[in-house]
Structure formats: C-alpha cells, structure tokens
C-alpha cells in the first residue's frame, strides 16, 4: 500500500475530498490516504508540501503561485474549484468601522504572510486605490486566532471566506462590512515534487478519482445536506453558496487563468518579474482529459 498524505482547509469546498476518502475507492487501488485539516490556511499548506508533511495539498491559487515563486518545492497539477472565492471583510461587532471605507489604515489580521488573508488584504487595498506600503499586519494563525485578536483589540480587520465566518456574523461576534471576490479561480491541487517523483501513479490515480467523485457529488440530490451536516452550516447558507461555486469537472490547467494570477500578483510586487506559467505547473500528460 502506498501512503498519501493529503490536506486542505476545513471548509465546504473540500466536501468531495471527504467523500472520496470515506468511500474506500483509493484503498482498492493500493493507496492508503490520510487527510489533515490545515486551519492556518494556504501559507501553512505550502510550507507543509515543501517540508514533506503533505503529498497533495488543496491551496488557494494566489498562495500556491506565490509559494512556488518563493522556492517551495511543489507544483500545481490542476484547478480544483473554477469559480472565484468571495472573501468577507470583517470587523469586530463593536468596531467604529461602519463601512468598508473605514478600514483604510487599520490593522489587518492574517493567518500568516503569503496566506490568502494576507494577499487578499493587499489586493483589496490596491483595488480601492489605497497605499499598500503602510498596511499593518497581525499574524493570528487561524480563525480561532482572529477571534482572539478581535476580542483583545489587537487587530481591526479580517478577510476570510464569507460562509465560513457567517455563523460569527449571525451571532454578533463579527460584522461584515464588505466583500471581495478573487479575480481568478480560487483553488488548485498541488503535489510536492518529492511525492510526484516517488508516488507518481498513486498521485495520478488519486487526482483522477477525485474528479469522478466531484461529478458524482454535483449530481447528488443530497449535496446540500451533506455539506450542512459535515461542516455545521445552515441549509440556506449552503444553498446560497452552491449557487456561486463551480468545481472543475475534470483535471485541467488553465494557462490564461494562471497568467491572470501572476499578473495580479506582479502588479502588487508579490512575485518575481520573471515568473512564468511553466514554472508553476506539473506534467499533466498522465491525467485523464
């Protein structure tokens, strides 16, 4: 049996992975998979792939691109979610910030540098015409850390996926003052260089099996209940979220979308000027088309 270490954020986007791992299909192909939730987000996932703690990781596109550019030893093998991600822009419920214009110059909570919460804070500020040079960041590790940071007044603003934080907005702990969509597809499947060299067939079998699971899941009449029960989300929130999300139906790399991501990050001086799409991607020839 080939052991495969897989990881991602504990969010509803990864429901197809959870169903695949529970199905026993991979074991029939001689693969023993394990899943780890990374509450710290994409920056932590990129480091885990580099360190050998993960073989396959599901990362935010912008974080994967920046991680590879900074020398992390993994590649993008496929887009996983083709739709963009809607980030909620949150402040503490008792904040003096009444609308999104009020967050300019405030302290941003981020899970870590290079994470989606970090990059999207910069993308948002740039889109609003604000200076990005003087943005102050407070590293809080994860959503739990963000709640603590807000509670003790250590930060003022926090970007996180809007439905993941909706229960905190509903309870009155957070207030959402705005939203920002990513200007590119949101999640990619990444494979460590070491895993691809040593476990190539297991990796490719797993990725192909995942997309079969994605298509079964999307055709399922129970998908709303599955997500609601597994991730403890309200049914109406899952229904609203599903209207805007689109998983990739098959393994694919979209060079134009990756170039858009590179260009966006270059415009913010977050990646090297000489970064090219070819630097980011793994060989796709063995994956089903």
Question: Can you say where each PLM-predicted feature lies in the sequence?
Answer:
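Conserved C-terminal helix/tail region of periplasmic/extracytoplasmic solute-binding proteins
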Residues: 266-289
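Secondary-structure end/capping motifs
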Residues: 197-272
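Short, glycine-/small- and polar/acidic-enriched structural segments
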Residues: 2-130, 137, 156-162, 174-177, ...
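Pocket-lining segment of extracytoplasmic ligand-binding domains
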Residues: 144-228
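Generic structural marker for isolated residues within well-ordered, non-membrane alpha-helices
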Residues: 22, 121, 165, 224, ...
